[in-house]
């Protein structure tokens, strides 16, 4: 006999806004009972001395020094562009009329 009844599964399905058939209710009752038995095993692990944490590994940001380096000149940046207007990339208009 599952610890979770068919009615409890139906109630959970209603709360979750899931439309389950009678066969699905019976199937999920057994599956949820099995899942809860596995969760119970995990809760029995002695962990009183383990502090609460989000991640067991230390997480640190890996950054590089913020150093200014020379970039491309405008001419170099625009050299590969298919179309240029007024020292800018020219692209097809996609929104409304131009100004």
Swiss-Prot record:
**Gene3D superfamilies in the record:** Glu-tRNAGln amidotransferase C subunit, N-terminal domain (1.10.20.60)
Known EC number(s)?
6.3.5.-
Q: What are the UniProt keywords, alphabetically?
A: ATP-binding, Ligase, Nucleotide-binding, Protein biosynthesis
The reaction(s) annotated as catalysed by this protein in its Swiss-Prot or TrEMBL entry are: L-glutamyl-tRNA(Gln) + L-glutamine + ATP + H2O = L-glutaminyl-tRNA(Gln) + L-glutamate + ADP + phosphate + H(+); L-aspartyl-tRNA(Asn) + L-glutamine + ATP + H2O = L-asparaginyl-tRNA(Asn) + L-glutamate + ADP + phosphate + 2 H(+)
Q: Which GO terms describe its biological process?
A: glutaminyl-tRNAGln biosynthesis via transamidation; regulation of translational fidelity; translation
**Into which EC class is this enzyme placed?**
ligase
Q: Which GO terms describe its molecular function?
A: asparaginyl-tRNA synthase (glutamine-hydrolyzing) activity; ATP binding; glutaminyl-tRNA synthase (glutamine-hydrolyzing) activity
Provide the function of this protein: Allows the formation of correctly charged Asn-tRNA(Asn) or Gln-tRNA(Gln) through the transamidation of misacylated Asp-tRNA(Asn) or Glu-tRNA(Gln) in organisms which lack either or both of asparaginyl-tRNA or glutaminyl-tRNA synthetases. The reaction takes place in the presence of glutamine and ATP through an activated phospho-Asp-tRNA(Asn) or phospho-Glu-tRNA(Gln).
| Subunit-level organization | Heterotrimer of A, B and C subunits.
Entry similarity comment: Belongs to the GatC family.
Q: What is the protein named?
A: Aspartyl/glutamyl-tRNA(Asn/Gln) amidotransferase subunit C
Q: Which gene encodes it?
A: gatC
């Amino acid at each position: 006999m599952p610890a979770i009844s068919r009615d409890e599964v139906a109630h959970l399905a209603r709360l979750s806004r899931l439309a389950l058939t009678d066969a699905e209710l019976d199937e999920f009752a057994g599956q949820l009972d099995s899942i809860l038995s596995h969760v119970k095993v995990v809760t029995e692990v002695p962990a009183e001395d383990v502090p609460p944490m989000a991640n067991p590994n230390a997480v640190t940001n890996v950054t590089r020094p913020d150093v200014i380096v020379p970039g491309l000149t405008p001419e170099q940046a625009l050299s590969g562009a298919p179309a240029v207007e007024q020292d800018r990339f020219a692209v097809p208009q996609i929104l409304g009329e131009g100004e």
